[in-house]
Amino acid sequence: MTNIRKTHPLMKIVNNAFIDLPAPSNISSWWNFGSLLGICLILQILTGLFLAMHYTSDTMTAFSSVTHICRDVNYGWIIRYMHANGASMFFICLFIHVGRGLYYGSYTFLETWNIGVILLFTVMATAFVGYVLPWGQMSFWGATVITNLLSAIPYIGTNLVEWIWGGFSVDKATLTRFFAFHFILPFIIAALAMVHLLFLHETGSNNPTGIPSDADKIPFHPYYTIKDILGALLLILSLMLLVLFAPDLLGDPDNYTPANPLNTPPHIKPEWYFLFAYAILRSIPNKLGGVLALISSILVLILMPLLHTSKQRSMIFRPLSQCLFWILVADLLTLTWIGGQPVEHPFIIIGQLASILYFLIILVLMPIISTIENNLLKW
């Protein structure tokens, strides 16, 4: 009798994706983050579902409904903080996952990479609309500032902003539609993640050497299932340490003040995972220029396959490119720090230099260094 997992129409799909999938024998722990992102997504959908059962998307009651969840609902506080800090873990995994793709040249899988960039945009959109829901000061002013950026679009900008707001300011209509978006987007992310996996399994995984591994494959189960379970345990451990010991570490104290349109907070800033893009936005004095730079900071990832001039796929044997990669990581950390600082000297100039360096490394220096490395190897 043949095994049911190989014959049953549904089980066959699961089997080919998670059990009998031929995987390279040498993929390191940097390859764990795809599965961790899946776990983060499931965790966010589940905690979000329970939060939505008690949340009300009305400007008069949104803030107090979140307080009610934390104080009166059984284990509401842990669900709320798992959801808030789960978003941070999601973005940590996301940034490492993208960084891994850049380092090991995984962007040469064009379809997988492009779907991944779309996924990144979608997750960022979801996190943004979600941050508005508690209706604290930073929620309200963050929504006002970021949606207002669309007014920089020539001719249709102002109409577009008012259309998104559902009125002439961020108000009840905005909150209601943001809640609707925040509820539907994770399911769109889940669907896109399946397409992402579908394209990945067409080509098979990359590996640290960047060399085709067709000659040396091992089954996904039990080797990588065990490895993924270890990663998942470490993820849940770090999340629970954050939730139980420092739940407000990554949040903004201003968001514990109910939204007040008449009182602007001294420093409007988004959550930490948007600070690098926010710093790039602020470093350009022109509104439209800032918006274009903001979008380009993520959209530049789509160009990575075109900018790959090296004759080797991975950076593992390219020390000059490695140096440049880690300078880029340091630059992004600098931008994240600058995004959280007030707009004053010396932070303005540091932000501008870091923003220039970011685009310079990706668009100019990396292709040049790769060509130099080719010449050094007489290729």
Swiss-Prot record:
Protein name, per record: Cytochrome b
Other observations noted: Heme 1 (or BL or b562) is low-potential and absorbs at about 562 nm, and heme 2 (or BH or b566) is high-potential and absorbs at about 566 nm.
Described purpose of this protein according to its UniProt entry: Component of the ubiquinol-cytochrome c reductase complex (complex III or cytochrome b-c1 complex) that is part of the mitochondrial respiratory chain. The b-c1 complex mediates electron transfer from ubiquinol to cytochrome c. Contributes to the generation of a proton gradient across the mitochondrial membrane that is then used for ATP synthesis.
TM region positions: 33-53, 77-98, 113-133, 178-198, 226-246, 288-308, 320-340, 347-367
GO MF annotation terms: metal ion binding; ubiquinol-cytochrome-c reductase activity
InterPro entries the record matches: Cyt_b/b6_C, Cyt_b/b6_C_sf, Cyt_b/b6_N, Cytb/b6-like_sf, Cytochrome_b, Cytochrome_b_C_euk/bac, Cytochrome_b_N_euk/bac, Di-haem_cyt_TM
CDD domains, per database record: cytochrome_b_C, Cytochrome_b_N
Assembly mode: The cytochrome bc1 complex contains 11 subunits: 3 respiratory subunits (MT-CYB, CYC1 and UQCRFS1), 2 core proteins (UQCRC1 and UQCRC2) and 6 low-molecular weight proteins (UQCRH/QCR6, UQCRB/QCR7, UQCRQ/QCR8, UQCR10/QCR9, UQCR11/QCR10 and a cleavage product of UQCRFS1). This cytochrome bc1 complex then forms a dimer.
Keywords: Electron transport, Heme, Iron, Membrane, Metal-binding, Mitochondrion, Mitochondrion inner membrane, Respiratory chain, Transmembrane, Transmembrane helix, Transport, Ubiquinone
Binding of heme b b566, residues: H97, H196
A Pfam family annotated for this UniProt entry: Cytochrome_B
The keyword Electron transport is assigned to this record: yes
GO cellular component: mitochondrial inner membrane; respiratory chain complex III
Binding site residues for heme b b562: H83, H182
Domain of life: Eukaryota
GO biological process: mitochondrial electron transport, ubiquinol to cytochrome c
Sites where the protein binds a ubiquinone: H201
Extent of the signal sequence: none
Its membrane topology: Multi-pass membrane protein
Residue runs in coiled coils: none
Similarity comment: family membership: Belongs to the cytochrome b family.
Key word Metal-binding present: yes
